[in-house]
Amino acid sequence: MNLVIALLINTGLATILVMVAFWLPQLYTYLEKSSPYECGFDPLGSARLPFSMKFFLVAITFLLFDLEIAILLPIPWASQTSSPYSLLSLSGVLLALLTLGLAYEWLQKGLEWTE
């Protein structure tokens, strides 16, 4: 019961803080706040540069594969199995899944940088 009360209080407090953090800055908008800051100088050009969607997709793909490798590395220590064959089969399945994902991205031309 104490755990439920603590979780509800923490969830409520976090929700209130997030709402205040999003709504409070929107109340006071003025020119200096909405213009780009360039070390005290007047802005020379537009601060809104076009963003390459291809770069974004390659970056997200890299992050996904990097996260999967980070999950794969501690498997020998995190696994509670006594048999090394089950550990090798689990690692093999994860590596096969990574390889299939990479092959799919390659075939869909998700790794090519040409615009």
From Swiss-Prot:
Core subunit of the mitochondrial membrane respiratory chain NADH dehydrogenase (Complex I) which catalyzes electron transfer from NADH through the respiratory chain, using ubiquinone as an electron acceptor. Essential for the catalytic activity of complex I. Core subunit of respiratory chain NADH dehydrogenase (Complex I) which is composed of 45 different subunits. Interacts with TMEM186. Interacts with TMEM242. One of its GO terms (biological process) is mitochondrial electron transport, NADH to ubiquinone. The keyword Transferase does not apply. Its EC number is 7.1.1.2. The chain crosses the membrane at residues 3-23, 55-75, 87-107. It comes from Ornithorhynchus anatinus (Duckbill platypus). This is NADH-ubiquinone oxidoreductase chain 3. It catalyses: a ubiquinone + NADH + 5 H(+)(in) = a ubiquinol + NAD(+) + 4 H(+)(out). It is a multi-pass membrane protein. It holds the Pfam family Oxidored_q4. InterPro entries: NADH_UbQ/plastoQ_OxRdtase_su3, NDAH_ubi_oxred_su3_sf. GO terms for molecular function: NADH dehydrogenase (ubiquinone) activity. It is found in: Mitochondrion inner membrane. Its main location: mitochondrion.
